């Protein structure tokens, strides 16, 4: 991968020098890295949508970027020799060193909790899974937010690094590119090095945006992982290309800007929407005579063409905004079960799909949704504004000054800051209201960037209106003091992280194995052998289950262990459920714990439950498997041991062939006439997600004798949320019925109590040749009992 990244950077440098016409060598290098990386993501996505296999698509996209770079290298001499300014290099070196210290420390010191989705997504892309699905719900398509993972998978195709190491390389390289891009954006838009240094410093260390009573992010250096390196590489590259377009409207500049801007939608739709709207607004502003006088000939045409190209790329790329527009334009489309709505079940599914609903106006209006508890925070309230950095407070004055100076780049960044707060305060995003923290950080970052650009303009104005050196130096000192005060939070965070590193050196993880063990402590050589077997023998669209952490149903542990197994085996997992949310506030994960079927299977080893789960492989940790379940596995038809590790911890892989399982018995519908549930016993006094056997008393009236094997199962309805639980929380098995007229029979059923305390209704069903027949129901409640609370034993058989 490292060689591929270097070649990508060289190609990007050539394209910026020869096609965009950038002469400053460091500028061409940093913008080239960001543009080439972004171009690879966009091209790879478009090629895959033409149904080209993943590995072939990765080589084609990479080859196209290298080819464009080679063309640029051949044309570079036409714009003259490359220019290297020693002072710029020194300032960039100092800023890059500080950023590197924080970025690498944060990458090494601990795992990113958001990697629960990114690790397996990258792995599935490498397996060739496209279009992509949610790794935790293989039957659910995933909309949006995948560009970063797609690009990383494309580069990892060239080998030489694992997923975690690749993420570290990606974060460091792209953040360094953004250092250079922020610097040169400030220098070009703000008129000199004062703006360049101020903008870069504030963007990385002085944003200070968020909720003061929850979490405030100091800047890009603190959000070093997840999607952020790629998102802001796109963001600053687009702004720089916009600035270059204003200076010289070259076709290559307009095309590159349009491709990157349109592709941003599949990486981070929120940032695309805001940036695209701001650029469109400023393009309209150039039509105003007083503003348009400062625009070079041809800029309006080039800008319009670039924005039109961005819109087309957005529509065909499959990102969330493009999908919503296409769906809205398709008048023949009808609402489906996957369409987000106000029901609890659809709310749960929307989280797994990243499927966003948008309504206007938001109630209450002009409020932000707190990321922790979901409460409404008025946009202009002291509790919110008082928690933001100084850049947001200075934004109105900075915008007035930049408008007076006709600084179009500064106006764009200022509009991004304003829209990033107005949009989430005015529009309701349904399940994702709690995610408006992303908007808030973008607003704070854009405000910091705007103030940095404005500070350079102020300094240029002072320099042009006074000959006094002490006034100039006083202005520089004032700007430096303001930046330093805003960076204090970043350095406190750095010192705390450094204290953690020195106090707990075992948390400083560098190798790929150490990074995996940060999520899954027992991961070792036996796991590596088992995962390699699945990488070699697993196929696309096959699914996996594992019993990692079977003794600990904490959602975070189940999630982390599943993430590591999936990412190393490159197979999705069919073990989780769509959970109903009792409240709609804050940031909510779509993956919280095992489904009832998964818990019941690993407890009982029942082959009928396994059939309903439909995995293709079982990844078994024998030491956490009960003896009864281990024995049951060896007796299930269609389940065959395929691999056992020879080194390290014992790991066993089972192959599941559903076609080899015997047909499930069914009764005739007529034979169930007069059959009804008398009572369901054993539903009292248990805590959420606890397994037990319940007893169903079934009675029958009528002359027809009911006798034979049948599949009997239950479904649950959450009476508190007024919604059915997910199908994965329905459990059934095969039992033998033999009931005569007036008789009754007690059947035991595996049962897992629902995950939320509250009131429920259980309905009992029997499968027949003519469909499922409901034979009765019972209401019950689940209390939030503390772990270890004793509860009644199930009645004896």
Question: What is each model feature region?
Answer:
Residues 1-11, 64-65, 94-97, 226-237, ...:
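Alpha-helical transmembrane segments at the extracellular/periplasmic loop-to-helix junctions
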Residues 18, 234-253:
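Membrane-interface transmembrane helices that cradle and orient dolichyl/undecaprenyl
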Residues 280-282, 296-315, 458-500:
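Signature aromatic-anchored transmembrane alpha helix within multi-pass, membrane-resident enzymes
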Residues 1-84, 792-796:
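Membrane-embedded, hydrophobic transmembrane alpha-helices
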Residues 253-268, 280:
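Membrane-interface alpha helices of multi-pass inner-membrane proteins
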Residues 86-234, 269-273, 506-523, 544-553:
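Active-site lumenal/periplasmic loops and adjacent helix-entry segments of GT-C-fold
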Residues 78-87, 247-252, 290-303, 397-419, ...:
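Membrane-interface helix-loop-helix junctions at transmembrane boundaries of multi-pass membrane enzymes
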Residues 333-341, 403-407, 482-664:
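Extracytoplasmic
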């Amino acid at each position: 991968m490292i060689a591929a990244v270097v070649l990508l950077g060289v190609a990007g440098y050539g394209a910026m020098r020869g096609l965009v016409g950038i002469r400053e060598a460091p500028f061409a290098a940093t913008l080239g890295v960001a543009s080439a990386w972004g171009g690879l993501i966009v091209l790879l996505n478009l090629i895959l949508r033409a149904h080209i296999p993943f590995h072939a698509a990765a080589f084609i996209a990479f080859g196209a970027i290298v080819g464009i770079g080679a063309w640029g290298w051949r044309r570079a001499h036409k714009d003259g020799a490359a220019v290297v300014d020693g002072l710029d290099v020194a300032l960039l070196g100092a800023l890059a060193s500080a950023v590197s210290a924080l970025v690498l420390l944060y990458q090494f010191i601990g795992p990113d909790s958001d990697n629960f989705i990114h690790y397996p997504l990258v792995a599935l892309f490498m397996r060739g899974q496209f279009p992509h699905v949610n790794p935790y719900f293989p039957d659910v398509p995933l909309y949006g937010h995948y560009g970063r993972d797609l690009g990383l998978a494309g580069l990892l195709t060239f080998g030489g690094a694992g997923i975690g190491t690749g993420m570290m390389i990606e974060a460091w390289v792209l953040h360094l590119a953004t250092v250079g891009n922020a610097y040169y954006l400030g220098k070009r838009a703000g008129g000199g090095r004062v703006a360049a240094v101020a903008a870069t410093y504030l963007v990385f260390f002085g944003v200070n945006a968020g909720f003061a009573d929850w979490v405030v992010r100091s800047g890009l250096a603190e959000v070093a992982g997840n999607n952020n390196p790629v998102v802001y590489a796109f963001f600053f590259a687009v702004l720089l290309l916009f600035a270059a377009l204003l200076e010289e409207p070259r076709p290559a500049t307009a095309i590159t800007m349009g491709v990157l801007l349109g592709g941003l939608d599949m990486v981070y739709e929120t940032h695309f929407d805001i940036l695209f709207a701001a650029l469109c607004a400023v393009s309209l502003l150039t039509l105003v005579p007083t503003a348009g006088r400062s625009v070079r000939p041809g800029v309006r045409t080039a800008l319009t063409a670039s924005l039109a190209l961005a819109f087309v790329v957005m529509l065909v790329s499959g990102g969330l905004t493009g999908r919503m527009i296409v769906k809205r334009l398709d008048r023949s489309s009808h609402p489906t079960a996957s369409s987000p709505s106000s029901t609890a079940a659809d709310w749960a599914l929307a989280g797994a799909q990243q499927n966003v609903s948008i309504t206007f106006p938001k109630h209450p209006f002009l409020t932000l949704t707190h990321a922790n508890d979901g409460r409404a925070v008025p946009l202009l309230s002291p509790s919110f504004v008082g928690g933001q950095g100084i850049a947001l407070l200075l934004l109105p004055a900075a915008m007035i000054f930049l408008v007076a100076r006709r600084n179009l780049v500064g106006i764009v960044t200022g509009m991004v800051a304003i829209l990033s707060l107005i949009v989430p305060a005015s529009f309701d995003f349904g399940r994702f209201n709690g995610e408006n923290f992303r908007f808030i950080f973008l607003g704070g970052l854009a405000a910091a960037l705007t103030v940095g650009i404005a500070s350079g303009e102020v300094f240029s104005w002072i320099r042009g209106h006074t000959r006094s050196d002490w006034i100039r130096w006083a202005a520089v000192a004032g700007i430096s003091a303001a930046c330093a005060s805003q960076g204090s939070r970043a350095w406190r965070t750095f010192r705390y992280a450094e204290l953690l590193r020195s106090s707990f050196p075992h948390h400083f993880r560098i190798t790929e194995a150490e990074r995996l063990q940060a999520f899954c402590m027992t991961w070792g050589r036996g796991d590596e052998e088992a995962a390699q077997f699945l990488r070699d023998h697993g196929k696309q669209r096959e699914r996996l289950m594992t019993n990692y952490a079977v003794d600990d149903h904490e959602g975070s542990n189940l999630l982390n262990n599943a993430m590591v197994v999936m990412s190393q085996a490159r197979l999705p997992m069919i073990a989780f459920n769509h959970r109903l949310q009792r409240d709609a506030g804050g940031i909510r994960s779509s993956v919280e714990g095992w489904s009832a079927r998964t818990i019941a299977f690993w407890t009982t080893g029942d082959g009928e439950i396994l059939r309903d789960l439909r995995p293709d492989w079982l990844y078994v940790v024998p030491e956490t498997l009960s003896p009864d379940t281990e024995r049951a596995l060896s007796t299930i038809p269609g389940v065959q041991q395929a691999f056992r590790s020879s080194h390290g911890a014992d790991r066993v892989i089972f192959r599941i062939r559903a076609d080899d399982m015997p047909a499930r018995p069914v009764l005739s519908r007529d034979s169930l006439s007069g059959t009804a549930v008398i009572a369901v016993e054993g539903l009292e006094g248990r805590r959420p997600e606890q397994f037990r056997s319940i007893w169903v008393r079934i009675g029958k009236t009528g002359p027809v004798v009911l006798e034979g094997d049948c599949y009997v199962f239950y479904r649950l309805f959450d009476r508190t949320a007024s919604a059915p639980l997910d199908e994965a929380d329905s459990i059934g098995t095969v039992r033998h019925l033999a009931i005569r007229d007036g008789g009754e029979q007690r059947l035991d059923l595996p049962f897992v109590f629902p995950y939320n305390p509250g009131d429920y209704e259980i309905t009992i069903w029997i499968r027949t040749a003519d469909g499922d027949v409901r034979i009765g129901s019972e209401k019950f409640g689940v209390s939030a009992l503390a772990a270890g609370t004793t509860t009644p034993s199930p009645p004896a058989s």
